[in-house]
Swiss-Prot record:
It comes from Aromatoleum aromaticum (strain DSM 19018 / LMG 30748 / EbN1) (Azoarcus sp. (strain EbN1)). InterPro entries: ADP-Glc_PPase, ADP_Glu_pyroP_CS, GlgC_bac, GlmU/GlgC-like_hexapep, NTP_transferase_dom, Nucleotide-diphossugar_trans, Trimer_LpxA-like_sf. The keyword Cell inner membrane does not apply. Signal peptide: none annotated. Involved in the biosynthesis of ADP-glucose, a building block required for the elongation reactions to produce glycogen. Catalyzes the reaction between ATP and alpha-D-glucose 1-phosphate (G1P) to produce pyrophosphate and ADP-Glc. It comes from the Bacteria. Homotetramer. The gene is glgC. This is Glucose-1-phosphate adenylyltransferase. It is an enzyme of class 2 (transferase). Pathway: Glycan biosynthesis; glycogen biosynthesis.
Amino acid sequence: MIAGKSVLAFVMAGGEGSRLHPLTAERSKPSVPFNGRHRIVDFVLSNLVNSEIYSIYLLVQYKSQSLIEHTRRAWVMSPLLPHHFVTVVPPQMQHGPEWFQGTADSVYQNLHLVELVKPDLVVVFGADHVYRMDLRQMIEFHIATQADATVAALPVPLEHTSSFGIIRTDSAGRIRDFREKPESAEPMPGRPGHALASMGNYVFSADLLVDALRRAHSRGGHDFGKNLLPAMAERNRVMAYDFTTNRMRGIRDYEEPAYWRDVGTIDAYYDANFDTLGEFPKFCMSNPHWPIYANPDQTEAAQVHDGHIRTASLGAGVVIRRAVIERSLLRREVVVEEGAEVVDSIIMDRSVIGKGARVRRAIIDQYNFVPPGMKIGYDPEADRQRFHISESGVVVVGKGQLKP
């Protein structure tokens, strides 16, 4: 209960994540590893649980097995508390032989779960962002403003508006116009060069959400941003919640205020990982007041057998043998052999960097064996023939692409 209201959460975790390919070749975007031992989905789930929202349905679709397995291992709630659960929900085809047709349709196809739980409020959040947020503050705002729906929002540069739902509000914060990914947008009053963007996170009064979903479905509308919210903004009281006002305990002075990243591209994903690195990171993964939970790891501690290490994150079970590691993140059970160099790179679980190999500005997905002496990130033309290269030049080696 929050402010006397019962709350049910739907997490939309069915995204295909095509712009994150090849990291999403065998997994969905929310299941992509992040930092030392997390998955992207862990951020929204941690925000919900830390906000005392314990009734959570995780809506999955594309390449969901990795996400299902992670949820089963990392997000087990007490069976003694019936309203404490993180339950994975694949498409049930309740209304015919169709997968989820859009974000709103994923919730529409599961309205029976709303009727089962009978909450006062329903929160609908995405699963592919890196941030901390106390949802209780947004819910209290929703109640205080007597909103039918509330959209979490923050300013974005005008050149990025085509990637977001763009909001226009009146002086009281009520949404008067909602356009999904427009080619251009007007600047915010008092913020030249910026527009107010939806974060894809919503709070709804339950009865009104059910009614709005049924209306949208009857008109062939399947998406929150394209269909449901623009229609609700015309009929109902829909408010914008300013994410920058969300207060979080434990944030250090050097961290970026109201940190939030959409990690939907390789470059955005790469940059967000490195935002967590260093003595004064923009986003510190460690905050005892608001932990980001992860799969409990029983692996042995990392081992370093000589070498040069500077500004690095080493996961459990990492072994480094007389190697050079600079400004890099190494996840569980990575092995870096003698004479190898890893610089400005992300090396994922159980990959091996062979003797004398050199890796620079790259993402090496799980279960790869970089052969002795191989160079990755030093010759763009040679790398492009074998691997994926992002717009900014980050080399991505797909899961298990390099075999022993």
